[in-house]
Amino acid sequence: MADDTDNPPNIQIPAKSYGFPPEAFDPRRLPDYDTNFLPAHDLEAFIQALAAPDFVQSPDDASSMRLNSPGLHSPSSLDITKDDYDHSEARAALASVADVAAPGGGNNHHRRTSTGTFFSAHNDWAPVSEKVIKTDRDEKRNKRGKDRKNKKPRKGVAPLRTLVGTRSKDETREGYLYSLLKWPFLLFVSFWIVGLGMAYLATRFYIYFYEQFVAWRGRREQLRRAMRATGNYKDWVAAARNMDDFFGNQRWKEENDFAYYDSKTVRRVWDQMRRCREKAEEVERELESQSQNSDSGVASGEETSNTKAGGGNNGNDKKTQPVEDLKALIEACVKNNFVGIENPRLYSQTYYGTKNLVQNYVDEVERSIKFLIDTKQLTKEQKRVMFKGICANYGRTALCLSGGATFAYYHFGVVKALLEVDYLPDIITGTSGGALVAALVATRTNDELKELLNPALAHKITACRESFTVWFWRWWKTGARFDSVDWAKQCAWWCHGSLTFREAYERTGRILNVSCVPSDPHSPTILCNYLTSPDCVIWSAVLASAAVPGILNPVVLMMKNRDGSLEPYSFGHKWKDGSLRTDIPIKSLNLHFNVNFSIVSQVNPHINLFFFSSRGSVGQPVTHRKGRGWRGGYLGSATEQYIKLDLTKWLRVLRQLELLPRPLGQDWSQLWLQTFGGTVTIWPKSIPSDFLKILSDPDPPRLARMIHEGQQSAFPKVKFIANRLKIERLVERGRRETRDRRNAANAFTATGDGEGSYASHSIVDAMGGKHPLAPSSSGGAGDRRGSIESILSEDDLRSLLIKGREGVHTSGGSSTGTEDELTMTELEGEDDDGGTSRVSEGGSRNRYFEGALEEEDGALEVAASDHSRT
């Protein structure tokens, strides 16, 4: 994280630079190195939000007393309270909170800081001042209750209860056997799990030595070292092809048959698609020749071309038949994992590439889609409907960055590898430490990222700079090692200031997602993005996603208002680390953005230890028996799988039988029982010293190694990702180019009765005060990837304005009313990204539209704006 200093840091160029040039270690070359993105008023708003009590988390705590009671803030009002002199500590705590939370904290010393206890009648008829005569029995009972209430706990008991954790009354099961057998059964299962863990480590050591001294020897070891020493993707591909030639994998590529996909169907579809495209290209050339040689000129030639494309003349039916067949074939075959062509095993038998038949099919689909985008034989409406259906069936791709403390810096290498070949997905999600990397990627353009992803970035990572004596006393007093305010100052640089999720989407076109877990163990997890929480400030979500119990206390999410000020989001509730429940939010991504192809970079240390692919993974085949064997032999792989499955079984037993306590008030069972992988899972190779430095800032040499290892782990997956993304981006291009781009400016002109003027102003107000046809003010590479002009047609906009005018007349409002008199109706429907539009909690109602209204089949649906790649 960022640490602003006036003196330039020392430049350290290690002996082993991992292919980085000397200037890559100079921090002064980093963009915005000395920029302080966090204004003082934003930081002050965050401090006040942290000081405010969380009523949901601790409604009965002394810190959650009302700050708006008449006796505290309204001296002029009728004071019907009395001082409670028995809670001096509570009054002092309340006074400190009030001083921090008040806007003019320095002028609040004269206010009353006593807590108020309101009088209440015994019933509806008894007066307030009625004298109540207490019996001796009541006095003794009240005295015993006060003594029990005022009894202080023994030293060490309260921290121990917090550390061990307890369940509430509603969560605790009843029964004598449960109470008697709970702890013995917990001890037995715990010892058994420890024994299984030791056996698993022994098995992994056996497999490691087997591969090092049996599988990798001689020439193959030299080729592997040469491949791991490469610093860019081009050199890696050359080294990977040498490995394939040595192991004879080329013969496997030439054979079409394979058990994990339908080779016969792929071959038939490929031949038919190629023939249809070639015939359609011949017809296209004939139409272009007729258009150029026409006696009536260019205009009549275009009209003739459009007439032929419409298929209205019987003489042209044969000419339009090839393109119709090609269109039908593309609609039927361009689907997610069609007949198994996206099976990871197709890319797990070689170091580079896949079956020649599969590669030919992918290349032919790419050429056919390009032809359908540019052809004149289909109308724009036909193309629009076609690409809309293909987009829904094919889905989208997302890059998921896991948590893992300082292990998360391996993500820099993964992002750098994908950025080098221009295959970085537009949808990015991060959790805990991965959220910090995802925020950096989603708030910077490609050109900025290429300058940032260097070892010099280590000079901005200073979150763990404090000495042991400093952070230990903070942990002893507050229960957290790090300070939330200090992390907010540093995190703002990584998030490019107080950008919201919507503003980051506008700046780079990338969709950032951050997982956050509420402090309440039973409340649902939230996935922050520009749809669910558009006005939420990114750096606050990153802090919340990194708030591991014991490391960082839960924090408040912040929301940006229309005037740029910050205030607490979601009623001031506090949130914490998202990896405790959903490290990889696959289901939420599919719900909001139709993601069905996930690239997961997994670096969690407690998960990385248990990763083992007995049959090889994408770009990393098994060397034993030419890819048809088992890693470590069959006995080693079978033992590893059995122990790992048995460990999972006993962890589920602990959770289902409610045997586990809740240390620090958190259910930790999900740490091992989640889904941690995706369609493609990248596992950067760590070293033992990373576990010792799990909460230590990396220096430039260490960060250079982590970036290099991240690249090396991502290079084998690039070919698989490339075959997926090049088709997906062509489909997005077809969607973008087939939308109606006619000028919608005339829809904003005022009509005679002034209704058009009012409707246009309401649209401008809904867009945050910016005209939809106004150019972007950011300029350069930072421009957003699309504009409302490119996604909103004239007819759609007129329909929108008519709906707005009808709403005004129905409510009886005037055409000259203010923006508060016109509320926007929530539109529910399927958007282009497969998600559902909704009014998010804490979002402003008068924001501009993120999608265009398309009227099709008599129904309105909200279409999210697609953006062209920067």
Curated annotation (Swiss-Prot):
It comes from Neurospora crassa (strain ATCC 24698 / 74-OR23-1A / CBS 708.71 / DSM 1257 / FGSC 987). Residues 131-141 have a biased composition (Basic and acidic residues). The keyword Transmembrane applies. This is Patatin-like phospholipase domain-containing protein NCU11180. It is an enzyme of class 3 (hydrolase). It comes from the Eukaryota. Residues 818-834 have a biased composition (Acidic residues). GO terms for cellular component: membrane. PANTHER family: NEUROPATHY TARGET ESTERASE/SWISS CHEESE D.MELANOGASTER, TRIACYLGLYCEROL LIPASE PTL2. Residues 289-308 have a biased composition (Polar residues). It is a single-pass membrane protein. The active site is at S432 (nucleophile), D577 (proton acceptor).
